[in-house]
């Protein structure tokens, strides 16, 4: 097998999106599984759309997820530069070669002329395409246009009536007709920068990329890239186009404009998701190993990764499943580490002072331990722990309705008396007090525990009742009870 070299090639036009993170992650797993190399290349030819720190943000978030790369702008190998904007001197001789072999030509059509042509074609019911207006200009005609101040783009001369086939790792054989790709396409813009399809094909060849794994929104680009390979008599890489990611609730393609779902890695970082959990979750977006297991370490995923198991169906992004996976990892965390993760959120909400005392940290450890089994992400500690920081939790309608039960006043008065009598306020004593209430009132089960839980915590469900009351403290627990009574 050819040495595996794959690349993740982001454009610095925004932050790291879930879909782009998946592309990077599958390339990373494929490279590591095959003892290959994982390359970062920055595709920044669209200078107008690039944002400040876009490259830095993307790479920082990839590193946070746990990916390491073998070559990049900051760690160049022998195939640099690794930013397309720095490779113009590499592209230009190849553009000139296509011009001299008549595989490309200068086009002087203005944007206004092209738009008018497109509208006329649509009015005739034709698929928009470049009509070849400048395809056969004589040198004197070209000189006249340049004398008039027109600057050309360079168009690639698309072969007519030609079929292009490739075997896609995910989708099998794919065929394109050259007459259906929109006519001769631009490979160099007026500012001298190459277009995406030209630069990608050249870079993949010169950087010895063996496999190109990317989203299936790139399928339409593949025939254009194959034509460029053909023009230079180069062997193309193996292509694999991963299915789209859809919103599991709407069934629609994940769109950056859909604000009902968080879609950028840094948003999950800010909420206190764990990188290992994110890596695990993203790896299952459009790929699955044999079996039913869903929790995997990075080492497991590298060992198990098989590109033949990439899904042919759209991958459903399920935020609830991500919360579940993150919870599985959080439950296994060292308590001190998890507490350190949670404290900044409590500080930011004004619930805890900065640099809390050792005594306060011990109390916070108990608080975090109480909610660790159910916590989906670190920032959730603020919402989960409301009852410890508010005067009294607000009851919802279901809780209020339950407190209308016939035996509720009896249970709560008895429990209040039991708590007031306690000299030692710890979990065994609190559990003994609840048992004493059961014996005294004859009420048991849900009718015993639920009123106590609602009165003390304001919630119908939650962590262990004894531990909750102990951490709340005798004074506050009695205060909550009195407010309900």
From Swiss-Prot:
Protein name from the UniProt record: Glutamate--tRNA ligase
GO MF: ATP binding; glutamate-tRNA ligase activity; tRNA binding; zinc ion binding
HAMAP family: Glu_tRNA_synth_type1
Organism of origin: Enterococcus faecalis (strain ATCC 700802 / V583)
Job of this protein: Catalyzes the attachment of glutamate to tRNA(Glu) in a two-step reaction: glutamate is first activated by ATP to form Glu-AMP and then transferred to the acceptor end of tRNA(Glu).
PROSITE patterns to which the protein is assigned, alphabetical: AA_TRNA_LIGASE_I (PS00178)
Residues annotated for ATP binding in this entry: 256
Family matches, as Gene3D superfamilies: 1.10.10.350, HUPs
InterPro entries for this protein: aa-tRNA-synth_I_cd-bd, aa-tRNA-synth_I_codon-bd_sub2, aa-tRNA-synth_I_CS, aa_tRNA-synth_I_cd-bd_sf, Glu-tRNA-ligase_bac/mito, Glu/Gln-tRNA-synth, Glu/Gln-tRNA-synth_Ib_cat-dom, GluQ/Sye
Keyword Ligase: yes
């Amino acid at each position: 097998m050819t040495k595996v070299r794959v690349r993740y090639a982001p454009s610095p036009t925004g932050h790291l999106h879930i879909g782009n993170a998946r592309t990077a992650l599958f390339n990373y797993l494929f490279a590591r599984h095959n003892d290959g190399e994982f390359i970062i290349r920055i595709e920044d030819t669209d200078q107008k759309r690039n944002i400040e720190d876009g490259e830095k943000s993307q790479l920082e978030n990839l590193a946070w997820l746990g990916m390491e790369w073998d070559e990049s702008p900051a760690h160049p190998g022998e195939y640099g530069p690794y930013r397309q904007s720095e490779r113009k001197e590499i592209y230009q001789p190849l553009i000139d070669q296509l011009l001299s072999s008549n595989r490309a030509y200068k086009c002087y059509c203005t944007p206004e002329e092209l738009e008018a042509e497109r509208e006329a074609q649509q009015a005739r019911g034709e698929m928009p395409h470049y009509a070849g207006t400048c395809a056969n200009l004589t040198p004197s005609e070209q000189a006249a246009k340049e004398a008039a101040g027109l600057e050309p783009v360079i168009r690639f001369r698309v072969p007519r009536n030609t079929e292009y086939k490739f075997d896609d790792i995910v989708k099998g054989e794919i065929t394109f007709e050259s007459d259906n790709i929109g006519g001769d396409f631009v490979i160099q813009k007026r500012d001298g920068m190459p277009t995406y399809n030209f630069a990608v094909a050249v870079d993949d060849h010169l950087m010895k990329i063996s496999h190109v794994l990317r989203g299936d929104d790139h399928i339409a680009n593949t025939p254009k890239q194959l034509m460029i390979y053909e023009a230079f008599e180069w062997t193309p890489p193996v292509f694999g186009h991963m299915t789209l990611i859809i919103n599991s609730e709407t069934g629609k393609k994940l769109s950056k404009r859909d604000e009902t779902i968080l879609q950028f890695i840094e948003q999950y970082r800010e909420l206190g998701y764990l990188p290992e959990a994110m890596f695990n979750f993203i790896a299952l977006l459009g790929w699955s190993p044999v079996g039913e297991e869903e929790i995997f370490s990075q080492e497991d995923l590298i060992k198990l990764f098989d590109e033949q198991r990439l899904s042919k169906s759209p991958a459903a992004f399920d935020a609830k499943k991500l919360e579940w996976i993150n919870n599985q990892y959080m439950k296994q965390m060292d308590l001190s580490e998890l507490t350190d993760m949670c404290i900044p959120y409590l500080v930011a909400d004004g619930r805890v002072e900065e640099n809390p005392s050792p005594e306060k940290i011990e109390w916070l450890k108990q608080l975090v331990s109480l909610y660790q089994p159910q916590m989906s992400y670190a920032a959730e500690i603020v919402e989960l722990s409301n009852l410890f920081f508010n005067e009294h939790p607000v009851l919802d309608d279901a809780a209020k309705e339950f407190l209308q039960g016939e035996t509720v006043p009896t249970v709560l008065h008895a429990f209040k008396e039991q708590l007031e009598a306690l000299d030692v306020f710890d979990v065994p004593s609190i559990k003994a007090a609840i048992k004493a209430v059961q014996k005294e009132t004859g009420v048991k089960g849900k009718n015993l525990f639920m009123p106590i839980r609602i009165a003390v915590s304001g919630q119908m469900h939650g962590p262990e009742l004894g531990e909750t009351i102990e951490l709340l403290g005798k004074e506050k627990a009695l205060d909550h009870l009195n407010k309900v009574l």
